[in-house]
Amino acid sequence: MERLNPADCVYIDESGIEESLCREYGRAQRGQKVLGERMGKKAQRLSIIAGLNQKELVAPFHFKGYCDTEVVNSWLENILLPCLKAGQTVIMDNASFHKSTRTKQLLENQGCKLLFLPTYSPDLNPIEQQWAILKARIRKLKTPQQPLEDAIAQVFKQYG
């Protein structure tokens, strides 16, 4: 196996966020309970997709619903590919919607290589840790009155 230059590696992944995302803790006087509102029903789901190149978030995007091949290819073509340079390696998990012929073709036409991580190995994808950090920041910013999309956009802006 050839050795990859970390500067040429772009890890991509997607993650979901429920509209009901809220803080997991609060403060109160000793002996008092912290009360907060939280929806009891299943909320709308938003998904986020991005690349990670040397700790820098690349081409972050959020949308309503779940990820599929069409969404991935549209994001690749319109948002990620303009950020990539020929010779870079795009690394992603083995999700079935990553494995279309079109996905491979888009990357090859850009002069990029495609590499799949082994099945069930999120620990090999550094963007997984970024999702945890991102969701914690979103959780801090999100208020019951504020749409989740606004909190996500605000956090993406902080990443530059």
Where on the chain are the PLM-derived regions?
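RNase H-like polynucleotidyl transferase catalytic core
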Residues: 33-40, 110-126
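C-terminal anion-handling pockets and recognition modules
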Residues: 6-9, 127-160
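RNase H-like two-metal-ion nuclease catalytic core shared by retroviral integrases
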Residues: 93-94, 101, 115-138
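Extended, low-complexity cationic-aromatic segments
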Residues: 1-77
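Short, hinge-like loop/turn segments at secondary-structure boundaries
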Residues: 27-30, 108, 132-135
